Amino acid sequence: MIIQRLFGILYMLAGLAKAFPQFENVPAVLRQAAIANQGTWYAAASIWLGAHGDVINILVGVVLFGSGVILMLNPLWTTLVIYAQLLMMAVFVVILHQSQPQVMLLDGVFALAALYMLRGQYHRKPKPRTFPTTSFSLPTPSSESSFSAPLGDEYDVVIIGGGASGLTAASEFTHERVLVLEKSSTFGGNARYHTFNRLKHPTAGVCFQEPFPGSNMLRLLKKIGLEGKYKSNEKDTLVFFDTFLLLKCLGEIVVGFIKQPRYLLKLSVWGLTSQLFLHAIIGKPYVVAAKQLGDPIFADLYTFLDKFSPRGDFYPRLPWTPNGSWSKAHMELLDNISLYTYLFEPDKLGRLPEQLRPPARLGKLVENAVSTTLRVECLDIHDVSAYVGLHFLVGYLRGNLVTLPGGNGSISAGLCKYLSHQRNVTLQNHVQLTAVEPQHNGTCIQFTINGQPRQVQAQQIIWAAPKTQLATWLPGLPAKQLAAIKNIRHEDYYLANVFLSKPVLGHSFGGYMIEPDSNKDPFSWCKAGTCLVANWMDDHADVDVGVLTLLKPTTRSERQDRTAQNAFLALQQQTYAEIAKVLRNIGIGAEVIEDIQIWYWPAGLVTSVVGQQAEGVFETARQSFENIHFANQDSVGVGNIESAILSGIDAANAVKAQLMDTENVVEVAG
């Protein structure tokens, strides 16, 4: 601001000087220029300016003085004034350079100052604002009665936990009597959505890997009427590259395009190049590009990842199963190596089978992209294993993601709607569990509903809630299983929804924000990893407002036991600064922001670290105990909707097998 104010004073003085011909006789200067410019392509314009020198003198004086005042006051639209100054300088350099050659040096100094001021403008933090929301958001209480139906005394299956896992498990039963117990007011766990003027927006999970024929996900979507309702990000994904990170990696970019020369024939590539250098000059923080334009840079990594496609035989499935094409030895080999070492420290790798050997050299830009992709899932590139890391990179970086209106909340809503029409299933919210007591003929489950005590008898139980408190309810679990559960990591993540007075980026899914690490900001450990567009997800809403969703995951190494639980307003202001920078980069002022809501999900995402899949941590943790079976992300070790659905289906199949065995025993005894 010191330089900006200094030049603001100089502009004001220059404007005042136009009133004193003894300092600068503008009409005479313009007449001299008109003579010197004869025969040039701009001669006519120069002659016109010379003929109206007195008016031009007054106009220029007012403009210079006014722009100086603007530089001093520094309103939000100062950027436009600086661009106007640059345009005026360019015009007068063209007109005067022959008759007054010293103008090139003088205006060159002012142009450099203008570019410096532009950089400051694009990186300025907005003044703190107050917003209607002043605390972390919570799921909207259900408008329904607490009782979805009168409860019976006995059930074939009781499911504890009404998140995506529990609801999926319930949907697998067609004849058995099923009761789903949920402690909160709404079902869906971390897969929910809210609305803003009819526009659905996610409050937790957003997207999932594109399902392929025969997959559990596609079968579930078909069951609940959502097959074909999702949108793919294949052609609509943007990447927000930090400008100076991209500039530092220019050599890597050039090499990538030299290896893929056909891309040099695309006008969009040259447009991206121009955008990079322009943004580097004027200081815009991001270079925004379609994801496909980065393909040459990531070509070596993509070629390697294509060997592990979900549609092929060598996909690194989670959980690992012995009937897959990955041998246990190969899985254990990669699960005991960090992804960072595997991809970016080739000198530390021992001998690897040829099909598992990664590219010999991957650049810094690729490293940042890989790190950002995994960080969105609360995974640290140094902590996650190569096996688990490959699973995510194949699906989330190389593959296509799909989403529904409101994100994964549409899946939970679809499951609830489906189950509400199943006469064998009862959904019960507002439940507080008080006891789980195994008995000779099943298990007695005691709980309260809005403070009123109830109990039911269950032949089989599916525990679809997180396993963190299992020791309290099931102290008889084997010590090995309890130890495995204790070793499972759960990480915090935050999600911010920014409500706008008009739609923004509605043509795009949004995308990753690839930036270097910075510890200067107070919440650098909770920075935005993606900026997603609710209007694109819910494109049938046809509303005149917008919502941008910022995923703000945390990793254990960055978080270092810090939390924003009691610092909502500070985190909200940091989020405001983040989204204002994104909007300013695309030419939109922060005044379009109406509110910022933030959702805090403590211990909301399961992560798998080096060695845990090889050691069988999650396999041990999910082992059935007597008539109790387990379903949740922590049964798989992957924090996404696919693992929640898979674990729900697996638990339901285990229950069906147990019930069938019980029926067979009864028939034999009879």
Swiss-Prot record:
Q: Name the phenotypic consequences of knocking out this gene.
A: Cells lacking this gene show a white phenotype and produce 4-hydroxy-2,2'-bipyrrole-5-carbaldehyde (HBC), 4- methoxy-2,2'-bipyrrole-5-carbaldehyde (MBC) and a dihydro form of MAP (H2MAP).
One GO term under biological process is: antibiotic biosynthetic process
GO MF: oxidoreductase activity
**Which residue windows are transmembrane per the record?**
53-73, 76-96, 98-118, 238-258
Pathway-wise, it operates in: Antibiotic biosynthesis; prodigiosin biosynthesis
Q: What is its main location?
A: membrane
EC number(s) on record?
1.-.-.-
| EC category name | oxidoreductase
List the GO cellular component terms: membrane
Please state the gene responsible for encoding this protein.
pigB
Name listed for the protein in its UniProt record: Oxidoreductase PigB
Q: Which family does the UniProt entry place this protein in?
A: Belongs to the flavin monoamine oxidase family.
Protein keywords: Antibiotic biosynthesis, FAD, Flavoprotein, Membrane, Oxidoreductase, Signal, Transmembrane, Transmembrane helix
Q: What does this protein do?
A: Involved in the biosynthesis of 2-methyl-3-n-amyl-pyrrole (MAP), one of the terminal products involved in the biosynthesis of the red antibiotic prodigiosin (Pig). Catalyzes the oxidation of dihydro form of MAP (H2MAP) to yield MAP.
State the species of origin. Serratia sp. (strain ATCC 39006)
Signal peptide positions are: 1-19
Membrane topology note: Multi-pass membrane protein
Say if the entry is tagged with keyword Hydrolase: no
